[in-house]
Amino acid sequence: MKASYSAYDFTKSRERIDEILKGADADYQNKDSIPSRDDLTFTNGFNVRCSALFVDIRGSKAINDKHTKPVLAKIYKTYISELVAIMRNHPKVNEISIEGDCVWGIFDTPYQIDIDDVFEVAYRISSLIDVLNIKLRKRNYSELTVGIGASYGSSLLIKSGYKGSGINEVVWLGTLVSEAAKLCGYGNKLWLITKSWFRMCFMTT
């Protein structure tokens, strides 16, 4: 997020710290579905059940070492562009984040069919990489190998940043995203899903 200079005020800093720390535990509610971001303040939060999907390129250092910067830009732009497009196709996508060559999304999945649709997103991404690699191969560019990880569970949704500055972000705390990232680390080796997701998908009646 873009930022500009602002003098630090120690007194106001203490006031902001006290305002957050004195907040009541009741301000952090449990939700089965992701609430509106308009409901978030700097002093509340929501413990939400949802799904995370994490995609990351394997061996990106070798790709970076092989190609010129313009070629790298083309490879990454096409990869990221179409991952975002596919994730947005989920009817209940809530957030998409891009960090380097990693793209991850949060999905509101209160019902079984919503979770099934997240699996479909993963399948489409896998197919997309196959198509993209055909096009990269024709240009003698490095082909991409990616890991895909998915997790279902609880995440603490908060609004974090500097109050009044316009610099703030929605942050997803807890193990949900890191668990999806860990599963992504096994990418292109085998399919792995979390125990809670297995129960949701295969043990419901």
Language-model segments: residues:
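Regulatory cytosolic signal-relay segments
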Residues: M1-N47
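A broad, low-specificity signal for short, low-complexity segments enriched in glycine/proline
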Residues: K2-I17, D65-H67, D108-Q112, T145, ...
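N-terminal short leaders/motifs
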Residues: Y5, C50-A52, K135-N140
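N-terminal start-of-chain detector that recognizes signal peptides
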Residues: L21-D27, G45-F46, Y76-T78, V118-Y123, ...
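Short charge-dense sequence patches
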Residues: G23-D39, T68-L83, I129-R137, Y152
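Short, functional N-terminal and low-complexity linear motifs
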Residues: D27-N30, V48-L53, L72, H90-I96, ...
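Catalytic NTP-binding/metal-coordinating core of nucleotidyl cyclase/transferase enzymes
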Residues: D38-D117
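Catalytic beta-strand-to-alpha-helix segment of the class III nucleotidyl cyclase homology domain
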Residues: Y111-T205
